[in-house]
Amino acid sequence: MKKLLLRSILTKHLKENVIFDICKLKNTHWKYGIKSQLNWFNKYIQDNDVHHLAYIKEKLVGYGLLRNRSFFYQKNKKKYLYYDTLVVSKKYRELQIGKKLSNLTVKTIKKLKLHSMLICEKKIVDFHEKYGWKKVNKEKPQILDHKYSKSLSMMCFNQKKIFMKRKIEYFIFS
C-alpha cells in the first residue's frame, strides 16, 4: 500500500496552495468550478475550522472538514462541529482513505469534547453509522440559516442524550 500521511490543520494555518488543492479535489465531486469552490471557501470557512488532509506522495487525495459553529439549546448558545465535507479522489477510493479520515474526524470530535452534526445522502447513512453517528429525528433539530432537501438525512455524533429529546436550533453559516 502507498504511504498515507494524514494531517489536521486549522484554516488560519493553511497556505494558499493547499486551499487551491482542497478546492480542486472538492471540484472532482461537486462540479461547480474551481473559482466557485474558492469563492465558497473564502466566504464560509472560518479561521478555527479543522481541515483533515490525506496525502500520498505529497498529492492531496482525501479531505475532511469540521466547521466550528454554534447552536441554541433552551435559549443558550453552545458550540458544535458541523461535519461539512468528506471527499476522496476516485483513483484512491479503494485504499480506505475515507475510513481513515472518518476515524480521524471522530477522534477530533472526542478530543474537542463537542458534539457534531452532518447532513448526508441517505445512501451513505450506513457508512457514517459504522463510526458511531446516529440518525436524528427531523422534528427535533432545526437549521436556521440553511434549507436542505427532505431526501437528505441529519446525523449527530457525541451528542448528549438530553439534546436528542429537545429542540436544537443549528447555524451552519454563522
Segments from the language model and where they lie:
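Short coil/turn motifs at secondary-structure junctions
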Residues: 69-71, 91, 123
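A conserved beta-strand-loop-helix scaffold within acyl/acetyltransferase catalytic domains
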Residues: 8-15, 19-86
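Terminal substrate-recognition subdomain of acyl/acetyltransferases
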Residues: 1-3, 9-14, 119-174
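Short acidic (Asp/Glu) patches
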Residues: 67-68, 101-105, 135-140
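Short loop segments at secondary-structure junctions
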Residues: 56-58, 91-92, 157-162
